[in-house]
Regions:
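Short, solvent-exposed polar/charged micro-motifs at secondary-structure junctions
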Residues: 46, 71, 100-101, 135-138
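Alpha-helical interface subdomain recognition
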Residues: 1-78
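Internal helix-loop-helix
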Residues: 53-111, 115, 119
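Glycine-rich, Trp-frequent "lid" loop and neighboring beta-strands that shape
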Residues: 109-139
Length: 139
């Protein structure tokens, strides 16, 4: 999804514009590869990177990486999950990893590294969700 392909009255600056762009990726390029994801183990790197470039996987992060809008991040994941649950889960993994990076206080994980992750230029996840939830006493 190229942001220039959006209708002129829809911009990525508005939550509705972002969700419209996410929906277009989900129902277009992602829908085209769902069978390959489910049956052949295709990793939707290009589709995830499109979603990241739109801001769909960083909406929950604080500025300058995101909008500090957890609700918008969840709605974006829901739009994708309606088409492909596996890709929706990968969005969650990317989002949580970004949140951990931002909250780490580690300069090496913020700045350029966080911005690359937030934009989808780099993809990642966390293998330590359960220990981190326990440590933060949210489980």
């Amino acid at each position: 999804m190229n942001p220039n392909d959006l209708p002129r009255d829809v911009t990525l600056e508005s939550p509705d514009g972002l969700l419209a762009a996410v929906r277009a990726v989900a129902r277009g390029p992602l829908a085209d590869v769902v069978e390959a994801i489910d049956r052949q183990g295709y990793y939707p790197r290009a589709e995830l990177q499109q979603l990241g470039a739109l801001g769909a996987m960083s909406a929950h992060l604080d500025a300058p990486a995101g909008r500090s809008d957890f609700g918008l991040a969840i709605r974006a994941m829901a739009e994708v999950s309606q088409v492909c649950g596996a890709t929706g889960f990968m969005m969650w993994c990317q989002a949580v990893c970004g949140l951990y990076m931002q909250a780490s206080g580690n300069p090496a994980l913020n700045g350029e590294a966080l911005m690359a992750h937030a934009s989808g230029a780099t993809l990642g996840g966390t293998a330590m969700s359960n220990p981190m939830k326990s440590y933060a006493q949210i489980e």
